[in-house]
Amino acid sequence: MARYSLGLGLCLLVASVSAIPVDNNVEGEPEVECGPTSITVNFNTRNAFEGHVYVKGLFDQQECRNDEGGRQVAGIELPFDTCNVARTRSLNPKGVFVTTTVVVSFHPQFVTKVDRAYRVQCFYMEADKTVSTQIEVSDLTTAFQTQVVPMPICKYEILNGGPTGEPVQFATIGQQVYHKWTCDSETVDTFCAVVHSCTVDDGNGDTVQILDENGCALDKFLLNNLEYPTDLMAGQEAHVYKYADRSQLFYQCQISITVKEPNEECARPTCSEPQGFGAVKQANQTAQFFRVLKKRSAPVMENILDVRAELTTLEVLEGNLPSSLTQAQALVASREIGEDSFRQELCISSFHISVVTVFLGLTVFVAIFITYMIVSRMMVPSDKMQSAC
């Protein structure tokens, strides 16, 4: 009995040692500094930091990773023009959002349970200044009452299958999805929306334009000309594709908001049928972003906003993807085929094995007991006969 207890104690000791996490973690909330040309994120750690701080998906790029350690502070500074920092203009509220996702990894080589990922966002507000001067007015003045109508709030979604599908984060090559742009307004029949200047990039600077400045499609194999079911909605079906060596796709589009004329329809782009392979590779547009941080000088830019959507493409060319994987924020639960699937179906837990073993043992014991009783009863008459003789 002592031998079994010692063995059990050793097993528990080994299990407890193997389950020890990294002895460090983030203390409190991260400190974010929104600078004129960069975002700085700092973290306080419980013990001296010996890991990495990097932009999600860009660990291999040295400029997007900070490996400094030895102190109880970790952080990284990210310029706007590097590391896939997202920049989107907004009309409500009016300004520019700068967004990125930063990962704090405490192990030098692997991601562990104590690591954390933070979505960091800075907002640069545009302020309209009113300049006035003193003038003479007559005794009779006219009072003006102005009601400000808020601008629409727009979003870009990639849905599964069609316009009523669920948003997707993961998809396979060739899967049918629906690109949908929607603007919500507090008023009815007041605004018109036109989607244009759409690009897709891999998060590593390889940007391709798929809708031109007029809102016309450039490559029918990537995205066809958009349809406008309502004044503030646009959409089009498409099939999922990916870059040759990158799984993530980052879409960004511009939406122009105009005031709708009474008793008239919203103006829509007049586009010809797009040709195949007409997508245009673009250069870095950082200079344009820095201009929008200042007061825009061109009136045409005043009512243009940016929207973004992301999609992770899985390179599965055959077979169907489980529905749980295509839903937003769902767990990845794919199954292997062939022998792996057969082994997975036969795999049961240790608890179930114990229950089955006990049940089989009881069954064998009962069977032996019944057999013994039957044999005993059959032996009784023969013994009596021998006694009589």
Swiss-Prot record:
Function: Plays a role in alae formation in L1 larvae.
Coiled-coil regions listed: none
Segments in the Cytoplasmic topological domain: 376-389
Name of the protein in question: Cuticlin-3
GO molecular-function terms, A-Z: structural constituent of cuticle
Regions of this protein lying in the Extracellular compartment: 20-354
N-terminal signal peptide: 1-19
Membrane protein topology class: Single-pass type I membrane protein
